[in-house]
From Swiss-Prot:
Protein name: Branched-chain alpha-ketoacid dehydrogenase kinase
SUPFAM superfamilies, sorted: alpha-ketoacid dehydrogenase kinase, N-terminal domain (SSF69012), ATPase domain of HSP90 chaperone/DNA topoisomerase II/histidine kinase (SSF55874)
Function of the molecule: Serine/threonine-protein kinase component of macronutrients metabolism. Forms a functional kinase and phosphatase pair with PPM1K, serving as a metabolic regulatory node that coordinates branched-chain amino acids (BCAAs) with glucose and lipid metabolism via two distinct phosphoprotein targets: mitochondrial BCKDHA subunit of the branched-chain alpha-ketoacid dehydrogenase (BCKDH) complex and cytosolic ACLY, a lipogenic enzyme of Krebs cycle.
Binding site for Mg(2+): N279
Molecular function in Gene Ontology: [3-methyl-2-oxobutanoate dehydrogenase (acetyl-transferring)] kinase activity; ATP binding; kinase activity; protein serine kinase activity; protein serine/threonine kinase activity; protein serine/threonine phosphatase activity; pyruvate dehydrogenase (acetyl-transferring) kinase activity
Regulation (activators, inhibitors): Allosterically inhibited by certain thiazoles and thiophenes: thiazoles increase interaction with DBT/BCKDH-E2, whereas thiophenes reduce this interaction. Inhibited by 3,6- dichlorobenzo[b]thiophene-2-carboxylic acid (BT2). The ATP binding is mediated by both potassium and magnesium ions.
Disease: Branched-chain ketoacid dehydrogenase kinase deficiency: A metabolic disorder characterized by autism, epilepsy, intellectual disability, and reduced branched-chain amino acids.
Catalytically driven reaction(s): L-seryl-[3-methyl-2-oxobutanoate dehydrogenase] + ATP = O-phospho-L-seryl-[3-methyl-2-oxobutanoate dehydrogenase] + ADP + H(+); L-seryl-[protein] + ATP = O-phospho-L-seryl-[protein] + ADP + H(+)
Annotated positions of the N6-acetyllysine modification: K192, K233
Originating organism: Homo sapiens
Residues noted as binding ATP in the record, renumbered to the chain: N279, D315, T334, T335, H364, G367, L370
Amino acid sequence: MILASVLRSGPGGGLPLRPLLGPALALRARSTSATDTHHVEMARERSKTVTSFYNQSAIDAAAEKPSVRLTPTMMLYAGRSQDGSHLLKSARYLQQELPVRIAHRIKGFRCLPFIIGCNPTILHVHELYIRAFQKLTDFPPIKDQADEAQYCQLVRQLLDDHKDVVTLLAEGLRESRKHIEDEKLVRYFLDKTLTSRLGIRMLATHHLALHEDKPDFVGIICTRLSPKKIIEKWVDFARRLCEHKYGNAPRVRINGHVAARFPFIPMPLDYILPELLKNAMRATMESHLDTPYNVPDVVITIANNDVDLIIRISDRGGGIAHKDLDRVMDYHFTTAEASTQDPRISPLFGHLDMHSGAQSGPMHGFGFGLPTSRAYAEYLGGSLQLQSLQGIGTDVYLRLRHIDGREESFRI
């Protein structure tokens, strides 16, 4: 039974409080502790939020509409005007588009199995989406620059409210993992939710960035992106993290088309590269624990052509065991999967996170790094593939389609 059908089964479509809160919270309600009472009240308010919006026709109507995805080229050429009209057009597009995409995700939460959807952490994320829909649809039509400025404030607030969504989803699924019977359904839900979130954040951040006058940028689009420079930035980050954990880190050599420059959106690389680099460095250090100050280099090769950008990350970290190879791109939230020892599957560097904010941080520590990176790459018309030589090392191939290439670009 899915969550939506159970929620609608209460008297008058209401949601019974006791099943929603679960035994643990029901027990706390009997406590005289002020803290426990506060938690129960928060859970009660959460249940009211979900209940009050489940039968709202606006969400159902918006969920039936298709999303209008833009190509980066469309965003690039619509991103400048002398009179500022591009800001109004962009804001009006967001005002129409964001509620539709968020309604699609609310529908996804409704389709989760009831026992998973009632997990307090998952329910909190569900509530965030419902509140975002409410705030966006309550905003009056954007008529002038003053309206647009207020809309920007709302967008910034929502971006901040949702910055920890990936971490929360991972936590919620790990908490309810013993109740997961259909892993394909949950993985489909995660793929759709995470890639939709990426698209929403790219569109929203692009609009906010249109207000900035930054050299070589139109919104979030860099007109002369250097893959070598962005790789170097995340190499420095991953090496610091690795040195903190192991006392040393592999050196990194970059070769190939190191002088390449082209229009591209850095944001997806800012999500994906830290995960791939941390994996390579951890695997290298874990396979050379006897000689931590004499470890092989990680080698990164850049290949640029008129269709796509390819980044190969090669490590000598011992490769991936045959038994793990088929599962390494899966989300790992079940008990059996949590026990694996492969560095690419187990939590990455524990919960040690030197990079806060909404970039790579949310993927850390839950075995979500590779599958999330794979989902992002596919959403952007590319791919993420592994070639492993067990006993030697692993090559990771990241392919991302150009936004101005010979073939049609991806849509956001």
